[in-house]
Design a protein with these regions (language model features):
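Signals and flexible motifs at protein termini associated with secretion
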Residues: 36-47, 80, 96-104
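Loop/turn positions that initiate beta-strands
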Residues: 75-79, 146
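Extended beta-strand solenoid/passenger and fiber regions
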Residues: 85-147, 152-190
């Protein structure tokens, strides 16, 4: 779990984040260091219940957060990585322009691009991944400069807190009741 904070790069007149901000990358929100926490994922039946409160988008989940979890204090836009599960991903990048993954990869499995004629696939070497997601090829096997290429691998599922769902009461008998929050796939952040 990573707590969100508004990035101070925002324009005071429009509220728009500076697109070239190196801290928030133009998103208007920055995140703190990761912290271990735990939560429960509610079923899709409960997620359909969330549709009554607003738009339901594929990738929305309802989290039930116990009061003894550090995540209990989460707020809007906080990021949550599901450390016990992973999913396949595929990203198209351009060599020399955006050699950087926007999602944290668990592992890379394949890199490929089309040949000059565009009629055959060329397999590349698996690059190293820097902490900021930048890809690097130390011993060759990189795509040609300016060429689009595909990176495939596995990543942890990542969500951001979309809305805190209303509940009648937060306490019972002096104890905090679990919270319910709607979380949305981080891929959809800002859309």
């Amino acid at each position: 779990w990573r707590r969100a904070a508004a990035c101070p790069c925002r324009d005071p007149h429009s509220g728009q984040a500076r697109p070239t901000c190196p801290v928030c990358e133009g998103r208007g929100v920055m995140w703190g260091q990761p912290r271990d926490a735990w939560t429960g994922l509610s079923s899709m039946k409960v997620a359909r219940e969330w549709a009554e409160f607003g738009e339901f988008t594929s990738g929305d989940v309802i989290l039930t957060i116990p009061s003894d979890s550090p995540l209990y204090g989460c707020g809007e836009h906080d990021r949550i990585v599901m450390a016990d599960s992973s999913e396949p991903f595929s990203a198209i990048l351009t060599r020399g322009e955006n050699d950087r993954l926007t999602v944290p990869a668990l592992r890379l499995e394949r890199v490929f691009w089309l040949n000059d004629a565009g009629d055959a696939v060329v397999e590349g070497a698996i690059p190293s991944v820097a902490p900021d997601g930048t890809l690097g090829w130390a011993s060759g096997g990189a795509p040609p400069e300016g060429r689009q290429y595909t990176v495939q691998g596995r990543r942890h599922q990542e969500y951001f807190v979309f809305k805190d769902l209303p509940q009648d009461r937060a306490h019972y008998g002096g104890r905090d009741l679990p919270r319910r929050v709607a979380a949305r796939r981080f891929d959809l952040f800002g859309r």
